[in-house]
UniProtKB/Swiss-Prot annotation:
Organism: Protobothrops jerdonii
PROSITE patterns linked to this entry: TRYPSIN_DOM
Top-rank lineage group of the source organism: Eukaryota
Family note: Belongs to the peptidase S1 family. Snake venom subfamily.
Protein name from the UniProt record: Snake venom serine protease homolog
Classification via SUPFAM superfamilies: Trypsin-like serine proteases (SSF50494)
Anything else known: Is devoid of arginine esterase, fibrinogenolytic and proteolytic activities.
Classification via CDD domains: Tryp_SPc
Proregion span(s): 19-24
A matching Pfam family: Trypsin
Location of the protein in the cell: Secreted
Any one GO molecular-function label of the UniProt entry: serine-type endopeptidase activity
Role according to the record: Snake venom serine protease homolog. May act in the hemostasis system of the prey.
Record flagged with keyword Secreted: yes
Length: 260
Protein backbone atom coordinates (compact mmCIF):
# COMPACT_ATOMS: atom_id res chain seq x y z
CA UNK A 1 0.00 0.00 0.00
CA UNK A 2 2.85 2.38 0.85
CA UNK A 3 4.40 1.74 -2.57
CA UNK A 4 1.05 2.40 -4.26
CA UNK A 5 0.70 5.71 -2.42
CA UNK A 6 4.23 6.74 -3.36
CA UNK A 7 3.59 5.93 -7.00
CA UNK A 8 0.29 7.81 -6.89
CA UNK A 9 1.98 10.88 -5.42
CA UNK A 10 4.70 10.75 -8.07
CA UNK A 11 2.03 10.55 -10.77
CA UNK A 12 0.27 13.59 -9.29
CA UNK A 13 3.53 15.53 -9.29
CA UNK A 14 4.16 14.59 -12.92
CA UNK A 15 0.69 15.70 -13.94
CA UNK A 16 1.09 18.97 -12.05
CA UNK A 17 4.43 19.65 -13.73
CA UNK A 18 3.01 18.82 -17.15
CA UNK A 19 0.14 21.23 -16.61
CA UNK A 20 2.50 24.04 -15.61
CA UNK A 21 4.78 23.34 -18.58
CA UNK A 22 1.88 23.37 -21.02
CA UNK A 23 1.04 26.89 -19.90
CA UNK A 24 4.26 28.01 -21.57
CA UNK A 25 3.08 26.87 -25.02
CA UNK A 26 1.31 29.42 -27.21
CA UNK A 27 -2.09 27.73 -27.27
CA UNK A 28 -3.84 26.68 -30.43
CA UNK A 29 -4.02 23.90 -32.95
CA UNK A 30 -3.38 23.42 -36.62
CA UNK A 31 -5.90 25.47 -38.58
CA UNK A 32 -8.40 23.61 -40.71
CA UNK A 33 -7.07 23.76 -44.26
CA UNK A 34 -10.34 25.35 -45.43
CA UNK A 35 -10.64 28.11 -42.81
CA UNK A 36 -7.80 30.41 -43.86
CA UNK A 37 -8.19 30.94 -47.61
CA UNK A 38 -7.53 34.67 -47.04
CA UNK A 39 -4.32 34.16 -45.01
CA UNK A 40 -1.12 35.07 -46.85
CA UNK A 41 2.54 34.75 -45.95
CA UNK A 42 5.05 37.58 -46.43
CA UNK A 43 8.72 36.91 -47.05
CA UNK A 44 11.64 38.56 -48.82
CA UNK A 45 13.15 37.31 -52.04
CA UNK A 46 16.60 37.09 -50.49
CA UNK A 47 15.72 35.27 -47.25
CA UNK A 48 12.77 33.17 -48.45
CA UNK A 49 11.75 32.92 -44.80
CA UNK A 50 8.34 34.13 -43.69
CA UNK A 51 8.57 37.18 -41.45
CA UNK A 52 4.89 38.18 -41.30
CA UNK A 53 1.38 37.34 -42.40
CA UNK A 54 -1.28 39.34 -44.20
CA UNK A 55 -4.92 39.13 -45.25
CA UNK A 56 -6.45 39.10 -48.72
CA UNK A 57 -9.41 41.52 -48.83
CA UNK A 58 -10.09 41.34 -52.57
CA UNK A 59 -8.39 39.94 -55.66
CA UNK A 60 -5.91 42.82 -55.80
CA UNK A 61 -5.37 44.01 -52.23
CA UNK A 62 -3.76 42.66 -49.06
CA UNK A 63 -3.73 44.19 -45.57
CA UNK A 64 -0.84 43.70 -43.17
CA UNK A 65 1.01 45.63 -40.45
CA UNK A 66 3.32 48.57 -41.20
CA UNK A 67 6.01 46.84 -39.14
CA UNK A 68 6.04 44.09 -41.80
CA UNK A 69 7.31 46.36 -44.58
CA UNK A 70 10.49 45.15 -46.28
CA UNK A 71 12.23 45.66 -49.59
CA UNK A 72 11.55 42.95 -52.15
CA UNK A 73 8.49 41.53 -50.40
CA UNK A 74 6.98 38.37 -51.82
CA UNK A 75 3.41 37.38 -50.99
CA UNK A 76 2.38 33.74 -51.01
CA UNK A 77 -1.30 32.84 -51.19
CA UNK A 78 -3.10 29.50 -50.95
CA UNK A 79 -0.53 27.86 -48.71
CA UNK A 80 -1.15 25.53 -45.78
CA UNK A 81 1.87 23.31 -45.18
CA UNK A 82 5.27 24.72 -46.05
CA UNK A 83 6.35 21.17 -46.89
CA UNK A 84 3.43 20.20 -49.15
CA UNK A 85 2.64 22.80 -51.79
CA UNK A 86 -1.01 23.08 -52.85
CA UNK A 87 -1.64 23.04 -56.59
CA UNK A 88 -3.29 26.47 -56.45
CA UNK A 89 -0.56 28.32 -54.55
CA UNK A 90 0.08 31.74 -56.09
CA UNK A 91 2.95 34.18 -55.50
CA UNK A 92 2.69 37.92 -56.02
CA UNK A 93 4.78 41.05 -55.53
CA UNK A 94 3.52 44.51 -54.52
CA UNK A 95 2.65 47.08 -57.16
CA UNK A 96 2.13 49.77 -54.52
CA UNK A 97 2.22 49.99 -50.73
CA UNK A 98 0.25 52.50 -48.66
CA UNK A 99 0.69 53.56 -45.03
CA UNK A 100 -1.08 55.89 -42.64
CA UNK A 101 2.36 57.32 -41.95
CA UNK A 102 5.80 56.40 -43.17
CA UNK A 103 6.45 52.77 -42.30
CA UNK A 104 9.30 54.03 -40.12
CA UNK A 105 7.12 56.29 -37.97
CA UNK A 106 4.15 54.14 -36.94
CA UNK A 107 3.79 53.61 -33.20
CA UNK A 108 3.07 50.49 -31.22
CA UNK A 109 -0.40 51.74 -30.44
CA UNK A 110 -1.40 53.57 -33.57
CA UNK A 111 -1.39 53.29 -37.36
CA UNK A 112 0.40 49.94 -37.59
CA UNK A 113 -1.25 49.16 -40.93
CA UNK A 114 -0.02 48.56 -44.48
CA UNK A 115 -2.23 48.24 -47.55
CA UNK A 116 -0.61 46.38 -50.45
CA UNK A 117 -1.79 46.50 -54.04
CA UNK A 118 -0.70 43.37 -55.87
CA UNK A 119 1.07 43.72 -59.20
CA UNK A 120 -1.23 41.06 -60.63
CA UNK A 121 -4.68 40.12 -59.27
CA UNK A 122 -5.16 36.62 -57.86
CA UNK A 123 -7.81 34.13 -58.86
CA UNK A 124 -10.14 32.61 -56.30
CA UNK A 125 -9.54 28.89 -55.93
CA UNK A 126 -9.90 26.00 -53.51
CA UNK A 127 -7.41 27.56 -51.08
CA UNK A 128 -7.62 31.27 -52.00
CA UNK A 129 -10.49 33.69 -51.34
CA UNK A 130 -10.81 37.14 -49.72
CA UNK A 131 -12.35 37.74 -46.30
CA UNK A 132 -15.13 40.19 -45.48
CA UNK A 133 -14.27 43.58 -44.04
CA UNK A 134 -16.20 44.44 -40.87
CA UNK A 135 -19.66 46.00 -40.97
CA UNK A 136 -19.42 46.88 -37.26
CA UNK A 137 -16.68 46.81 -34.63
CA UNK A 138 -16.48 43.64 -32.53
CA UNK A 139 -18.40 43.47 -29.27
CA UNK A 140 -16.62 43.23 -25.94
CA UNK A 141 -16.23 39.55 -25.06
CA UNK A 142 -16.47 38.35 -28.66
CA UNK A 143 -14.67 35.08 -29.34
CA UNK A 144 -12.26 35.67 -32.22
CA UNK A 145 -9.83 33.54 -34.18
CA UNK A 146 -6.18 34.50 -34.59
CA UNK A 147 -3.94 32.58 -36.98
CA UNK A 148 -0.50 32.43 -38.52
CA UNK A 149 2.76 30.56 -39.00
CA UNK A 150 4.35 32.31 -36.01
CA UNK A 151 6.27 30.59 -33.24
CA UNK A 152 4.27 28.18 -31.07
CA UNK A 153 6.66 28.38 -28.12
CA UNK A 154 6.92 31.25 -25.66
CA UNK A 155 10.52 30.50 -24.72
CA UNK A 156 12.18 30.04 -28.12
CA UNK A 157 11.29 30.44 -31.78
CA UNK A 158 9.65 27.19 -32.85
CA UNK A 159 7.90 27.61 -36.17
CA UNK A 160 5.36 25.04 -37.36
CA UNK A 161 5.10 24.03 -41.01
CA UNK A 162 1.35 24.71 -40.92
CA UNK A 163 -0.61 27.73 -39.63
CA UNK A 164 -1.94 27.51 -36.10
CA UNK A 165 -5.28 28.95 -34.96
CA UNK A 166 -6.42 29.93 -31.48
CA UNK A 167 -9.60 31.38 -30.02
CA UNK A 168 -9.16 34.53 -27.94
CA UNK A 169 -11.52 37.17 -26.58
CA UNK A 170 -12.00 40.87 -27.21
CA UNK A 171 -11.13 42.52 -23.89
CA UNK A 172 -11.69 45.99 -22.55
CA UNK A 173 -8.90 48.34 -23.61
CA UNK A 174 -8.28 49.11 -19.93
CA UNK A 175 -6.88 45.58 -19.52
CA UNK A 176 -4.13 46.37 -22.01
CA UNK A 177 -3.50 49.77 -20.44
CA UNK A 178 -2.98 48.06 -17.09
CA UNK A 179 -0.56 45.61 -18.71
CA UNK A 180 1.49 48.12 -20.72
CA UNK A 181 2.30 51.36 -18.93
CA UNK A 182 3.02 53.50 -22.00
CA UNK A 183 -0.29 52.94 -23.76
CA UNK A 184 -2.27 56.16 -24.31
CA UNK A 185 -5.75 56.64 -22.92
CA UNK A 186 -7.28 55.84 -26.30
CA UNK A 187 -5.99 54.27 -29.49
CA UNK A 188 -7.29 52.66 -32.65
CA UNK A 189 -6.35 49.19 -31.49
CA UNK A 190 -8.19 46.17 -30.12
CA UNK A 191 -7.10 44.48 -26.91
CA UNK A 192 -7.54 40.71 -27.28
CA UNK A 193 -6.35 37.58 -25.54
CA UNK A 194 -7.03 35.24 -22.64
CA UNK A 195 -6.69 36.73 -19.16
CA UNK A 196 -5.23 33.54 -17.68
CA UNK A 197 -2.66 33.40 -20.48
CA UNK A 198 -1.61 30.45 -22.60
CA UNK A 199 -3.11 31.61 -25.91
CA UNK A 200 -1.63 34.44 -27.89
CA UNK A 201 -0.23 35.57 -31.22
CA UNK A 202 3.56 35.62 -31.18
CA UNK A 203 6.74 36.28 -33.18
CA UNK A 204 6.21 36.42 -36.96
CA UNK A 205 2.42 36.35 -36.57
CA UNK A 206 2.53 40.13 -37.08
CA UNK A 207 0.31 41.43 -39.85
CA UNK A 208 -2.02 38.44 -39.69
CA UNK A 209 -5.79 38.53 -39.18
CA UNK A 210 -8.04 38.51 -36.14
CA UNK A 211 -11.37 37.10 -37.34
CA UNK A 212 -14.56 37.68 -35.33
CA UNK A 213 -17.87 36.22 -36.52
CA UNK A 214 -16.47 35.73 -40.01
CA UNK A 215 -15.27 39.33 -40.35
CA UNK A 216 -11.74 40.71 -40.43
CA UNK A 217 -11.56 42.89 -37.31
CA UNK A 218 -7.91 43.14 -36.33
CA UNK A 219 -4.33 43.05 -37.60
CA UNK A 220 -1.75 41.42 -35.32
CA UNK A 221 0.46 44.24 -34.06
CA UNK A 222 2.29 43.57 -30.80
CA UNK A 223 2.05 42.22 -27.25
CA UNK A 224 3.95 40.97 -24.24
CA UNK A 225 7.27 39.17 -24.35
CA UNK A 226 7.36 36.28 -23.81
CA UNK A 227 4.00 35.71 -25.47
CA UNK A 228 0.99 34.21 -23.74
CA UNK A 229 1.56 35.62 -20.25
CA UNK A 230 -1.40 36.01 -17.88
CA UNK A 231 -2.98 39.47 -18.08
CA UNK A 232 -0.70 40.43 -20.99
CA UNK A 233 -3.06 40.38 -24.00
CA UNK A 234 -2.09 41.31 -27.53
CA UNK A 235 -2.87 44.51 -29.40
CA UNK A 236 -4.41 44.47 -32.86
CA UNK A 237 -4.85 47.35 -35.29
CA UNK A 238 -8.59 48.00 -35.46
CA UNK A 239 -9.66 47.44 -39.06
CA UNK A 240 -13.10 49.03 -38.60
CA UNK A 241 -11.56 52.39 -37.67
CA UNK A 242 -9.55 52.41 -40.91
CA UNK A 243 -12.33 51.39 -43.30
CA UNK A 244 -12.75 54.83 -44.90
CA UNK A 245 -9.02 55.05 -45.56
CA UNK A 246 -8.88 51.51 -46.98
CA UNK A 247 -11.87 52.05 -49.27
CA UNK A 248 -10.62 55.45 -50.44
CA UNK A 249 -7.20 54.08 -51.39
CA UNK A 250 -8.76 51.15 -53.26
CA UNK A 251 -11.08 53.58 -55.08
CA UNK A 252 -8.03 55.47 -56.36
CA UNK A 253 -7.67 58.31 -53.85
CA UNK A 254 -3.99 57.91 -53.06
CA UNK A 255 -4.00 61.05 -50.92
CA UNK A 256 -6.55 59.66 -48.46
CA UNK A 257 -5.58 60.15 -44.83
CA UNK A 258 -6.06 57.84 -41.90
CA UNK A 259 -8.25 58.80 -38.96
CA UNK A 260 -6.40 60.92 -36.37
Amino acid sequence: MVLVRVLANLLMLQLSYAQKSSELIIGGDECNINEHRFLVALYTFRSRRFHCSGTLINEEWVLSAARCDRKNIRIQLGMHSTNVINEDVQTRVPKEKFFCLSSKTYTKWNKDIMLIRLKKPVNNSTHIAPVSLPSNPPSLGSVCRVMGWGTISATKETHPDVPYCANINILDYSVCRAAYARLPATSRTLCAGILEGGKDSCLTDSGGPLICNGQFQGIVSWGGHPCGQPRKPGLYTKVFDHLDWIKSIIAGNKDATCPP
